[in-house]
């Protein structure tokens, strides 16, 4: 008779202990998992997305969760089991919770776990990391808001809409292909310190939501769709702007693809990855959009051209800080796999000041934009950067080497989105 599996993990699911029964049930030697993997490795990805959070909440609320589910052994074999989960505490239940203990017993029953449509939708969002596309879409809206605010009939509405969808699909393709190349390099597999939903890639391959080959196929399909939309945009673009649109688009695709793809793998080249993100999510995207939607010859209108360039600078800088702060928890695994970004190059302690410098540059560049436009309303997003950005930096400064840093990671993402939305609104007036 197979022994019961007993496994303990911390609050983030990282495996801390496992008994002999766990090795027998799941087929992994404990040396391969303890301190290196998370308990999600035992479950099908869709069950992780749909059920696990509910199990843990019930365990915390009632002191125990008991249920039946499917698990996966190291050899890929699926089996049916009874699972019992309890919260764990360091020194008694009156102290803060430290993790969970799970007891798994193999059962001779046919267990079917129905997967909801909403879970399948979440699966698609997870594989493509769609929620992060706001970083590329909001700069497009900012350019549209600028042209709408300074005059009438300055831009092609149809091309504006096509740009939104084209950039959206292109961003998704880059996300998926980045996961593919990180999978080949072993970067995401090596990473056990990631912050859930923030750093460490989508985890879609690691959770079994999609295969490595599947990411390659999906990324290729999305790229082709983006190119078709881009071709349509060109047919509607002012002929005087076509060359600029093609040049900027090719530059963006080049940077997006070779961000993680060999032989360039820009993310591993000590600052070139961060520069890539700044350009791709900043001036390139705002200038590309401006050339694509402007009804006249944009190169002959230096005022509009430079203003669209300036709009992209703070947005690109803030997106760069999202990347930078997400490199903190990933530093160890990235270093082990040769992903030599700025945090690996300078270390966590020194990289705090890089974050602050980028933040201050975003403040200054927004001030330059406000001065050029004569728009005092842009002082509102500047104030946001100073106040909220200052708070986030204080968290980073103190918590840079702890799991509590996740507050600053989410804060940086939120700040970039709110800033871009605020800029869009102020540019309309």
Model-derived regions: residue spans:
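Conserved hydrophobic beta-strand signature of PAS-family and PAS-like sensory domains
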Residues: 15-16
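N-terminal capping loop/helix in small sensory signaling domains highlighted by a polar->aromatic N-x2-3-F motif
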Residues: 19-22, 339
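PAS/PAS-like sensory domain cap-loop motif
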Residues: 22-33
């Amino acid at each position: 008779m197979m022994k019961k599996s007993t496994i303990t993990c911390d609050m983030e699911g990282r495996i801390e202990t496992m008994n002999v029964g766990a090795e027998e049930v799941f087929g992994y030697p404990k040396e391969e998992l303890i301190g290196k993997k998370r308990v999600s490795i035992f479950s099908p990805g869709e069950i992780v997305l749909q059920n696990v959070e509910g199990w843990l909440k019930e365990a915390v609320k009632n002191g125990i969760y008991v249920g039946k589910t499917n698990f996966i052994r190291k050899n890929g074999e699926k089996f049916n089991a009874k699972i019992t989960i309890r919260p764990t505490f360091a020194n008694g239940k009156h102290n803060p919770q430290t993790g969970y203990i799970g007891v798994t017993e193999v059962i001779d029953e046919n267990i079917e776990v129905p997967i909801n449509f909403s879970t399948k939708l979440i699966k698609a969002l997870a594989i493509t990391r769609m929620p992060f596309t706001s970083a590329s879409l909001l700069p497009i809206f900012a350019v549209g808001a600028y042209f709408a605010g300074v005059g009438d009939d300055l831009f092609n509405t149809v091309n504006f809409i096509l740009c939104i969808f084209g950039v959206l699909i292109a961003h998704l393709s880059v996300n998926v292909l980045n996961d593919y190349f990180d999978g080949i390099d072993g970067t995401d597999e090596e990473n056990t310190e990631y912050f859930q939903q923030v750093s460490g890639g989508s985890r879609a391959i690691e959770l079994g939501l999609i295969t490595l080959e599947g990411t390659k196929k999906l990324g290729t399909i999305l790229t082709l769709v983006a190119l078709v939309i881009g071709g349509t945009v060109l047919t509607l673009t002012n002929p005087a702007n076509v060359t600029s649109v093609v040049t900027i688009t090719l530059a963006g695709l080049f940077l997006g693809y070779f961000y993680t793809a060999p032989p360039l793998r820009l993310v591993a080249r000590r600052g070139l990855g961060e520069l890539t993100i700044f350009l791709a999510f900043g001036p390139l995207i705002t200038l590309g959009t401006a050339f694509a939607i402007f009804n006249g010859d944009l190169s002959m209108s230096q005022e509009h051209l430079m203003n669209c360039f300036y709009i992209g600078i703070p947005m690109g800088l803030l997106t760069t800080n999202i990347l930078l702060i997400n490199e903190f928890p990933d530093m160890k695994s990235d270093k082990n796999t040769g992903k030599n970004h700025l945090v690996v190059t300078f270390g966590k302690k020194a990289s705090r000041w890089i974050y602050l410098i980028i933040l201050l540059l975003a403040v200054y560049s927004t001030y330059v934009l406000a001065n050029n436009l004569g728009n005092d309303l842009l002082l509102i997003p500047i104030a946001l950067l100073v106040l909220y950005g200052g708070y986030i930096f204080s968290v980073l400064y103190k918590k840079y080497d702890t799991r509590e840093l996740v507050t600053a990671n989410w804060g940086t993402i939120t700040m970039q989105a709110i800033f871009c939305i605020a800029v869009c609104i102020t540019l309309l007036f």
